[in-house]
Amino acid sequence: MEKREELYRGKAKSVYRTDDADRLILLFRNDTSAFDGKRIEQLDRKGAVNNKFNAFIMQKLEAAGIPTQFDTLLSDTECLVKKLDMIPVECVVRNFAAGSLVRRLGVEEGIALTPPTFELFLKNDALGDPFINESHVQAFGWATPEQLAQMKTYSFKVNEVLNKLFEEAGLLLVDFKLEFGLFHGQIVLGDEFSPDGCRLWDKETRKKMDKDRFRQGLGEVIEAYEEVARRLGVPL
């Protein structure tokens, strides 16, 4: 697979074209951002940890019948993925109250949400990824009702699979965000799944093991990521 020019550079990943029109190379960098890119730092080993973590999770989801963008690992920091037409909507599933939900509704952090909630956000850094609803998605043509229904179904299926996986590792899956795209007309899970895009707490102590350690200045960010990977059995 020939790596060609950079197609897109995000806050923590870069995307490159290849000699296959249906495949891209995803590079995980050491950049770590918070507050819609207003704060960015370099954290040693982060790119490699997230690349391998993402590969592990995506393979688990594929095995559970959820189609993903992931194809194969290419190096410590690169993987080969399907080229998707991305839908500009983030799907967020919450099992416990945290983050923006706490700020928006004034509820106590850590309250269990039964059943889990499903939320939508427009993927737009300039606007701060605003909270939207299903009517907005349909009215502005970001996805069809059928596509949105499939995204919601897959989101809850991801929650079911990963809740069990993390619980067995002594972790609580507090919440997570997913992005989807179209591959030859079919809805496919895209982007990544790593501690950058979810909240994970130790089941016993409630210690935060995700990017909130960076956002809140708690320190030992990569050490926490590596501990999560170790508990799951991710080969680093």
UniProtKB/Swiss-Prot annotation:
Pfam families reported in the protein's UniProt record: SAICAR_synt (PF01259)
Catalysed reactions, semicolon-separated: 5-amino-1-(5-phospho-D-ribosyl)imidazole-4-carboxylate + L-aspartate + ATP = (2S)-2-[5-amino-1-(5-phospho-beta-D-ribosyl)imidazole-4-carboxamido]succinate + ADP + phosphate + 2 H(+)
GO-annotated biological processes: 'de novo' IMP biosynthetic process; cobalamin biosynthetic process
Leading EC class: ligase
The keyword ATP-binding appears for this protein: yes
Keyword annotations: ATP-binding, Ligase, Nucleotide-binding, Purine biosynthesis
GO cellular component, one term: cytosol
A GO MF term: ATP binding
Annotated metabolic or biological route of this protein: Purine metabolism; IMP biosynthesis via de novo pathway; 5-amino-1-(5-phospho-D-ribosyl)imidazole-4-carboxamide from 5-amino-1-(5-phospho-D-ribosyl)imidazole-4-carboxylate: step 1/2
Family matches, as InterPro entries: SAICAR_synt/ADE2_N, SAICAR_synt_PurC, SAICAR_synth, SAICAR_synthetase, SAICAR_synthetase_CS
Annotated EC: 6.3.2.6
Protein family per UniProt: Belongs to the SAICAR synthetase family.
NCBIfam families associated with the record: purC
Descriptive protein name: Phosphoribosylaminoimidazole-succinocarboxamide synthase
Gene name in the database record: purC
